[in-house]
């Protein structure tokens, strides 16, 4: 396996255990999603041929900044399906935010809005380009939705920003959504 493939595989496994199944690696997350870096290192080095320095490099070079290391603890920045409280503070959003998805999802979204599904929040992007990157990870045609974040916020909905800059909301009701002109 090439070094690049190994790094990708380790990063995906880290996302899996830090966001969805810590028990798969024998880990226990605290209430805010943190785990000892030493414990994660032990789990990763028993499964992969990586060193502590390799793991730190994977975290630091992750293009999506999925992880944060503080005081020998590590956590995923968002996207959890396990019960954690990321201790996020509500903030005022920009006027518009964006959500990239598969066009096949539009019929359900136009009836029900955006739901968090198995996650703690709906993930939103600050710009069309980022939403497009998210949307094109899925197969088939994609759709970029514009969220009227200013109106949503003024009507009492909360927004948060994760440590890696992803905007988060509990849900996005349909009245705040419109297909964006950036959609093909």
Swiss-Prot record:
The keyword Transferase applies. Keywords: NAD, Transferase. Its EC number is 2.7.1.-. It comes from the Bacteria. One of its GO terms (biological process) is tRNA splicing, via endonucleolytic cleavage and ligation. It is an enzyme of class 2 (transferase). GO terms for molecular function: NAD+ poly-ADP-ribosyltransferase activity; tRNA 2'-phosphotransferase activity. Removes the 2'-phosphate from RNA via an intermediate in which the phosphate is ADP-ribosylated by NAD followed by a presumed transesterification to release the RNA and generate ADP-ribose 1''-2''-cyclic phosphate (APPR>P). May function as an ADP-ribosylase. Belongs to the KptA/TPT1 family. NCBIfam families: PRK00819.1-2 (NF002013). This is Probable RNA 2'-phosphotransferase. It comes from Rhizobium leguminosarum bv. trifolii (strain WSM2304).
